[in-house]
């Protein structure tokens, strides 16, 4: 049982997936084609890349190391709403950091729990400081509808 503010969320797990144990792993459902920007790239460059590849986030890299994430929400709340110039603001200035991530061999249930606790909708998948993929709440719901209740609570409190 996970407590979110004053809510109690039950996690129901049923055997699914191809593995012998029936547990779905993050690596099985993550998106592998992750888009990145550098810390000194402009927010405008990040937006162009997000639009070009139709993604809701980009990972921010510093010397080939993932250091943060920029989501559509970051852009709206930290650039658009205060009416800042996306061409002059740098990725490092609006990214969410430190980066919350998960390992590829973790169960999807663990990913859903982290996302609910941290109130995030995108979770980078990393192994030894290398970005391997990204997991979204949509990926989890598609692969494991039993996780829907925890994600509904996530959306309700955010």
Language model features: what each stretch is:
Residues 36-54, 61, 101-119, 126, ...:
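The conserved cystathionine-beta-synthase
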Residues 50-53, 58-74, 115, 123-138:
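A glycine-centered beta-loop-beta connector
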Residues 13-33, 71-101, 107-116, 134-158:
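Tandem CBS (Bateman) regulatory domains
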Residues 7, 54, 81-85:
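A signal for specific C-terminal beta-sheet/loop modules enriched in small/flexible residues
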Residues 2-6, 31-35, 47-49, 65-72, ...:
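Short, mixed-charge, low-aromatic patches
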Residues 26-29, 42, 46, 59, ...:
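Residue-level detection of beta-strand scaffold positions
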Residues 1-19:
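N-terminal amphipathic/basic-hydrophobic helices that include classical n-h-c signal peptides
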